[in-house]
Amino acid sequence: MTAKPQLPERTPRVKGEPTALDGLLVVDFTRVVAGPACTQTLADFGAEVIKIENPDGGDDTRHYEHAEIGGESAAFLSLNRNKRGIALDFNNPAALEVARELIAKADVVVENFSGGIMKKFGLDYASVAATNPKLIYCSISAYGRKGEFALRPGFDPITQAESGFMSLNGFPDGEPVRTGPPIVDMATGMSACNAILLALIARDRLGRGQQVEVALIDTAMSMIGFYGMAYLISGANPGRIGNSPNGSPTVGVFQASDGPLYMACANDRLYRRLVVDVLDRPDLVTDPEFAHRKNRTANKEKLRAIIAGIFASDSLEHWMAKMKKANIPVGYLRTVEEGFNAPEVRDRHRLSRIPHPTAGAVPNIETPLQMSLTPTVDPVAAPLLGEHTREVLRKTLGYDERRIAALAEAGAFGKPGNTA
């Protein structure tokens, strides 16, 4: 039984170090996963990200039930670090005017509402581009902003299912399985971030902004990768293969006498080292049934049974030590708990704790991106709902206290009088 990780305080960055996106203003209308994942990366590297939420409950992920701390959900905390949060009721004309003023000042707008919502409120690209011609306007959706399916709602598992992505996940004798983590959402967020950065580079060269669009269905199809390319070339419909690509007898999960491991020996060189140096079975090299990759594939069930029987004869640590000595690609098959406590993770210093206004401190999982000259900003926990409304209106838009109070009284931030 492993222990809950002991999270250290996050080591501050060196004072005076530059950030990659310093001075970039991002107005963030996104919620749930793909959009917030995109804007969090921008915020991590120094962009000023202003997250706009509905005052009536805010981002859906605030109410996800995986876990909570200090009244905040794990999902929301994991996707909204380093942002400033404001609450605006779009049904209030005064709130819409605030949103338009923020867009007019922004370098980047990111939104992932259902089709037609931003247009309904006059906040779509066509409505705002004239007032800010250098604006990068990124729309994230399930099926795109144009075409027959533009108004159709959809989420990560729907696009996993409809793209064919889910059909490849699972075992041949079982049903298609969605991934546990929302992989299409996360990859769409990464793609949107890439697209925004490309558009910013183009703006520096061309002097004007543009509309950027990323759709979950497109991301899911691109992630099918060489399986999709193989289908287009051969016409053969790929199916589920479990843990071994093409049923390879030397790739996948194997059971030692006391636990599982995952091994990947996909070529002749690695196979020779495996059977000679690890399994002490040189006959599995000279036997013509197994001498080359094609032969091993043709006789995969027989070979896999032989290898599985050998692995079952000794302990996990015995085999891990031998395979690491032979430089065989192998890993422990861990739970999340085991993975987050593993030495490989501790060595990367990816986990820490950071201050939070209601919880005292919350866990922090660092971005996977590391840069030597422009590292990430010191992380700030995800905002409370509307936490920075007054601050943003005052510092970013130059509103005085009287104007802010009038907006609050008019219900621009939700119920009259509501403001941070």
Go through each PLM region and give its residues.
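N-terminal helix-loop segment corresponding to the beta1-alpha1 unit
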Residues: 1-205, 384, 390-420
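A glycine-rich dinucleotide-binding beta-alpha-beta segment and adjacent secondary-structure elements
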Residues: 325-377
